[in-house]
Amino acid sequence: MQSDTVKKHCYSSSSVLFVFVLALGAPLPAAALAQSDSGIARWIAAPHRTPRNVARDPFRHPLETLTFFAVKENSTVVEILPGSAGYYMEILAPYLKERGRYIAANRDEAAAPRYLADHQKLLARLKGEPALYGKVMVTKFNADKHEIAAAGSADFVLTFRNLHNWIQRNEVDGALRVFHKALRPGGILGVVDHRGRNDMTQEAQMKSGYVRQDYAIAVIEKAGFKLAGVSEANANPKDTKDHPEGVWTLPPSYRLKDKDRSKFEAIGESDRFTLKFIKQF
């Protein structure tokens, strides 16, 4: 059930907020990319990355996204649920290895059985490539137990395409409390997720995997964060958001398998918002 605060943000946003979001929503300027940390670009281009992850770069825009969040090589970064695929782990863990810290907050052995195999794959991968992942810290992020980092120790908490799941399961408030506790004052929460339609309520598209951007902002600000920026780095105007199996119709999931595959391949991965929040003191 939506709170009055959330409803107000979703259905009666002021013109001031609208202009603010539009002003922040432009793609990252070329000048900003030119000033991005060359270390991030180097690890994005490094040969250790899996071909499957590299193939997703045109849709996930890692350089633009991490530059927008302003991650630096001496940062302490907690990534929520990197999983065994480790798309951002492949980039962030070696980038932060010498001067910063990368923390993988993942489901562990206490999680549901369906997640156990993935967690074991993650641990095996870390152990098998110590030159890249030898300093990765693995912490817990289960539905009922969160020990992601010491209180006030993280410069960044980053979460990619997880918010919709927590909203569906009524776990979002608990997750945001954990993030707020882990971040230092002024620390950054970075959120990327499938952007929902503005002509539908959040409830109406809940099971599709999409989240209204204004709804996401309202929920997160209610938890003690302040919106600091909006990026269109991960936008996809081809995404009509009316697919038979929701966001999972599109790549890389292709839930319909070969049915209309060329159509959904032409659309590409989902339209996504990229939001940056600051922890309030």
PLM regions with names:
Residues 264-281:
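C-terminal lobe and adjacent flexible extensions of AdoMet/dcAdoMet transferase-like proteins
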Residues 103, 186-194:
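Conserved beta-strand signature within the Rossmann-like core of class I S-adenosyl-L-methionine
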Residues 73-84:
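Conserved class I S-adenosyl-L-methionine
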Residues 40-68, 72:
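Class I SAM-dependent methyltransferase Rossmann-like catalytic core
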Residues 147-157:
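A short acidic, Gly/Pro-enriched loop at the edge of an enzyme's catalytic core
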Residues 143, 165-178:
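A short, conserved alpha-helix within the catalytic core of class I
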Residues 116-145:
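S-adenosyl-L-methionine
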Residues 93-94, 172-185:
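A short glycine-rich, Lys/Arg-flanked "PGG" loop and its adjoining helix->strand segment in the class I
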